[in-house]
Amino acid sequence: MKITLLTKAYGAYRGRLLETIRSEISIMITELDATLISIGTDRKNRIVVNIEGEDEEFVSNALAKEYGKSLLSDDLSPNTVYPGRFVDVGKVGYGLYVDIGVIDSPKMDALVPLHKIREQLNLLAPLKSITEAFVLADYLPVEVILTNIDLYNNRIEAEFDQKVIARVKEWLHDDHERLLVFGANQRQIEGKLKKSGHREDIYEIEQLGKFEFSLRCKRSTRASGILAAIGPRLRGVPMHLFIPKELLAMQNA
């Protein structure tokens, strides 16, 4: 049985991330009649595993619960919340696309239109300014509510779930700067922080997705300093600065 998960493995450490998942699945199926035949990714970097055995259906359900599940377009429902990740940020100016895991059509990402983004974030800035300031970047996990489903034209429209807006507001009014790190596991991040002598400068490591993390800096620590320290040690790993003061200045401009 081939299973496509919502979790993605990507970037310079794609192989290591796949090995992380392989190890976790191997532990999961130790006492079951199931064998992990293969693990890899599809064209959108979603993890694809092949499981065989009497318990493959049980394992499939367990994997979907742990790592998120893929969908068929016919199963989509309006006014329903779906988890996903931003894709192709910056490639168009009319909105942001979110990969919610539809696997039977390569072009069925959910579009959050620019007017809806402006309305929900209470901003009138250009899309590029909004995405850069709020770090709405590729691979950032988000939840969206589907508002319109047009299967004939392969078009889905959505808006951000309140969880996303609440997270943005929480970060915005928090006086801790953040460094977002995508495409690494927590052990890697912890290790690089310790080697660079900066683990004590991080107040909290928040897990946003399986391989997506927010490093919440101590009040006396600048996120740019952490980026300079661990960036060279994790080459090829996307990292983004979230600076509340800069965002507030933008909102008040």
Where are these regions (language model features)?
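S1/OB-fold single-stranded RNA-binding interface
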Residues: 46-52, 56-147
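OB-fold/S1-family RNA-binding modules
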Residues: 1-68, 130-253
